[in-house]
UniProtKB/Swiss-Prot annotation:
E.C. code: 6.3.4.5
Enzyme class: ligase
Protein name: Argininosuccinate synthase 2
Subunit structure: Homotetramer.
Entry-linked HAMAP family: Arg_succ_synth_type1
Main localisation: cytoplasm
Organism: Rhizobium johnstonii (strain DSM 114642 / LMG 32736 / 3841)
Residues engaged in binding ATP: A13, Y14, S15, G16, G17, L18, D19, T20, S21, A40, G121
Lineage: Bacteria, Pseudomonadati, Pseudomonadota, Alphaproteobacteria, Hyphomicrobiales
Binding positions (L-citrulline): Y91, S96, N127, R131, S182, S191, E267, Y279
Length: 407
């Protein structure tokens, strides 16, 4: 707390919920600081006006509520999907990719309002504290960062509720007890963790899933869609061009209705522990499959394999919070270069939790009917050439075998 004694003005990442409302009041009462709130519309599906009204009720004069959905998808989600990024083989990084955007706006607002600190509501056990703070320091190395969950004296939900009552912070009746699990959501995904999900041997209750119907309840008839790409980014569905956020929202609807995008994962957190999360990424799951399909006919083999080699490192950088690091930007430049000719359309069949590629076409396709046909290729490929190719590639293996067979 001593390091905060000179803080006069703080920009708080504010959701309007109980926890960040308590943080807001704590900053006012314990630090005596003026608080500025920032609430981002990331497509989480919540009304944001209540956050404004609650901030006003708590005496806040400077309130920022910004619709960042297009920026989120255009500048963060789409660049990540150009890389086909997944953490530990399956996680589409829906929470991770939103944190640098929030930090960017916190820093921008701090500069605009003359604040000397920012604050967030991430706990001291999770990855988000790292992501928020690494991003903030990358953009302003001198900013002060306040993380109340690491500093305050509250030990339980009861302590928080008592503080709320003492300071007349409204508490909804359904918030009086501990929530059965915690939720984070944005336009790309929703994640649920904790409480009823902490035993990884037990199936998650169906009520945890808020973005998708169960695959068993999905329609018995498949849905077929076409996704169009330009320079590696999705630009259209069924021939209709859309903005990035509008397109992702539309894919979410297709995924939701067909039970697509559920993931039950035990992951390795950056801070060292394992955690179990239940994720729903309906549109992102469709997008990843479609992007890999269009790359399959437009990327050269060497470029495709190099991308696959660097992808785990790129995904790890995002998961750990290094979006604004030079190494992520270097990898991004390589990835973006690879996408110059990644354009065309992919036809997908969506059915009971599955995304199946049934067609792909591109004016920049490297797929040659003449080369792969089982019929007469009219001299496009001389099969006799394969003998020399194989013999040269076998040279080291034959040399090794001769040595090893000597007794």
């Amino acid at each position: 707390m001593a390091s905060y004694k000179d803080v006069k003005k703080v920009v708080l990442a504010y959701s309007g919920g109980l926890d960040t409302s308590i943080i807001l009041k704590w900053l006012q009462t314990e630090l005596g600081a003026e608080v500025v709130t920032f609430t981002a519309d990331l497509g989480q599906g919540e009304e944001l006006e209540p956050a404004r009204k609650k901030a006003e009720m708590l005496g806040i004069k400077e309130i920022y509520i910004e619709d960042v959905r297009e920026e989120f998808v255009r500048d963060f989600v789409f660049p990540m999907f150009r890389a086909n990024a997944v953490y530990e083989g399956v996680y589409l990084l829906g929470t991770s990719i939103a944190r640098p955007l929030i930090s960017k706006h916190l820093i921008d607002i701090a500069k605009k309002t003359g604040a000397d600190a920012i604050a967030h509501g991430a706990t001291g056990k999770g990855n988000d504290q790292v992501r928020f703070e690494l991003s903030a320091y990358a953009l302003n190395p001198d900013i002060k960062i306040i993380a109340p969950w690491r500093d305050w004296a509250f030990k339980s939900r009861t302590d928080l509720l008592a503080f709320a009552e003492q300071h007349q912070i409204p508490v909804a009746k359904d918030k009086m007890g501990e929530a059965p699990f915690s939720v984070d959501a944005n336009l790309l995904h929703s994640s649920s963790e904790g409480k009823v999900l902490e035993d990884p041997s037990q199936e998650a209750p169906e009520y945890v899933h808020m973005r998708t119907i169960s695959p068993e309840a999905a329609p018995d008839k498949a849905t077929t869609i076409k996704v169009g790409f330009e320079k590696g980014d999705a630009v259209s569905i069924n021939g209709v061009r859309m903005s990035p956020a509008t397109l992702l929202a539309a894919l979410n609807n297709y995924g939701r209705d067909n039970g697509i995008g559920r993931l039950d994962l035990v992951e390795n957190r950056f801070v060292g522990m394992k955690s179990r999360g239940v994720y729903e990424t309906p549109g992102g799951t469709i997008l990843l499959t479609a992007h890999r399909a269009i790359e399959s006919i437009t990327l050269d083999r060497g470029a495709a394999h190099l991308k696959d080699d660097i992808m785990p490192r790129y995904a790890e950088l995002i998961y750990y919070g290094f979006w604004f690091s030079p190494e992520r930007e270097m990898l991004q430049a390589l990835i973006d270069k690879s996408q110059e000719h990644v354009e065309g359309e992919v036809t997908l069949k969506l059915y009971k939790g599955n995304v199946m590629v049934i067609g792909r076409e591109s004016d920049k396709s490297l797929y040659s009917d003449k080369l792969v046909t089982f019929e007469d290729d009219q001299g496009a490929y001389d099969q006799k050439d394969a003998a020399g190719f194989i013999k040269l590639n076998a040279l080291r293996l034959r040399t090794l075998a001769k040595r090893n067979l000597v007794k």
